[in-house]
């Protein structure tokens, strides 16, 4: 089993662990119900999600098999 050659100092350990910080989630206001929600996600309160389409959508024909 591998063992370290030298002891890591407390300062070196602290410098390594300083990168373990958490980030605050980026919340925006829902345009439909004005509650806070995550970006690019469905609103948990009202279920609203704005999708912008560029250009016209092509219709898809669904064939039913009888």
From Swiss-Prot:
Pfam families: Ribosomal_L32p. One of its GO terms (molecular function) is structural constituent of ribosome. The keyword Coiled coil does not apply. Keywords: Ribonucleoprotein, Ribosomal protein. It comes from the Bacteria. One of its GO terms (cellular component) is large ribosomal subunit. GO terms for biological process: translation. HAMAP family: Ribosomal_bL32. This is Large ribosomal subunit protein bL32. It comes from Acetivibrio thermocellus (strain ATCC 27405 / DSM 1237 / JCM 9322 / NBRC 103400 / NCIMB 10682 / NRRL B-4536 / VPI 7372) (Clostridium thermocellum).
């Amino acid at each position: 089993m591998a063992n370290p050659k030298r002891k890591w100092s407390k300062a070196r350990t602290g410098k390594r662990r300083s990168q373990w910080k958490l980030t605050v989630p980026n919340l925006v206001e829902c345009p439909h119900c004005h509650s806070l929600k995550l970006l690019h996600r469905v609103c948990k309160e009202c279920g609203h999600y704005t999708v912008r389409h560029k250009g016209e959508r092509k219709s898809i024909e669904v064939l039913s098999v009888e």
